[in-house]
């Protein structure tokens, strides 16, 4: 790497550790110092000549006001576990399954009208006259009911401990007041917050950037009473924690119909992001989004009036913000900050329409990491953690620009880890070099353009619902992560986009997920027009790549609606007496690299024998291709992220786009990758592995052969 560079780095400062803060600010090339949850900045740090980010969580840290206005706390619907009646009455203790420090029953008149009791055996609501709430005991008693039927109660609760603070508190064994969260849906809360932020800006003249962490509503995170199942429900994309009787009343007024508890709790399944949303949920999301923009803009305008920038953290209480909604720019944010473990999260940040894109690296400077494993404590290896996260992120940074990087947490924890400090210095310099390359021009991409088709489309570009470790069970997150660092143009589309003609911009459409999921598409595949348009598009030369149960929907002659294009289908039990086409697997195009591993699915069968099976395992298809007109259908029964499988995906996409023979700017060693920036004539080569690697790259200036140390990056000029 070349001479030392500075800037584009946000350092978490810490009062009481001024010398360390200022020393690392210089070493890591920081231009900004921030505070974090649990830390402050002293005058010495504030006056040291750096930009200052100040973190505000707009809906918490207001305990005095919250205590005086406890009916303005944020809320949620909860549903009890189903109980079987053994006689004609049943008593259900509402809070039996839930963490008492997180929730308090809201039995106010406004909330109570939204409570529901259901007979889950019949699926019918129990009439109001058959149940009664006993406030003192916290029980709902149901009478005159059918023995041996199952019953649930859906009720409203106040959330009395803000979830991110609750997590940080329990993780770090803090002993301080539990922070509550207030709901800006109430006019009184809005007045209080507008006055509060005005006052805050007056008192923090040194702050250059107000870091909103985040806006109003947290993703749903319901904790249980039993440590054997502490996290009952967690969904990063869920709107469950935006609910209140006032929001529901205002919704009914605006949309002309009322939502019920059942619209949210869905018999205990909730309305998870992984299932296609019904129109009622989409209406409610739009309603909340409208409100969050309308009130959020007022707060941001005040920040701007005080000549400060407003950045927002794209995590935690981000719900209702929707950066991939066409209206996001109405907020007026100057910057977006995303915490990242993975490449797809860096791409999620870089694609947002905002002036400054910043990623917060991991590990976070806490003793333990998100999974509860030691980080900055005995048994931890923060340097190795940082390397693993950096190699995930680096490949994505080569494809699309990010403007800034940074860290968060307790800076003093890094003192016993000089190798960690050295490594952050190295990657900060690396990042600044990559950033400069993007300024000069875009990196080379292959010609084949890819679209990912699912029920959410653009709104959930790159992500599914949270971090990789929260969504690893879905094939698509593995595909997104693989794509995040490949030299391919990627967009995310939904079924309406197909109707509007988006296929004209695509060479390959990937549909990956289990039947009924938002990622496969579920009921959207009943739209014959979309099936027709996709079929015609493949016939004219496009490629449909299906993974797991693509286009799956019961009720038709085939389980996969695109079976005629794929040349295969899945037997769900109705073809048990039918004969099967035999096959011989031949990978004539050499698509499958050594070490690639695709887990097969039972009951996948060829429809008419015309599809070519390229790879199989134990007699089950693991990769197939089917010519259809000028195009093709390609099938993979699963996809799991690995270096080998990432190269397999790249090969399959190049094959789909008839680019297999063009190997320009693709490394011959799959443990390495490269990016070429034509305007700068700069080639960046990265080693993703923990071993020394030798790699050769075809360029327009001849072959380049390099040796790379474990995890290393080489940046070199080629050509003139």
What is the meaning of each model-derived region?
Residues 221-224, 231-234, 412-444, 566-571, ...:
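Extracellular ligand-binding/catalytic regions of CAZymes and related secreted enzymes
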Residues 605-620:
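Short, Gly/Ser/Thr-enriched beta-strand-loop segments that form substrate-interacting elements
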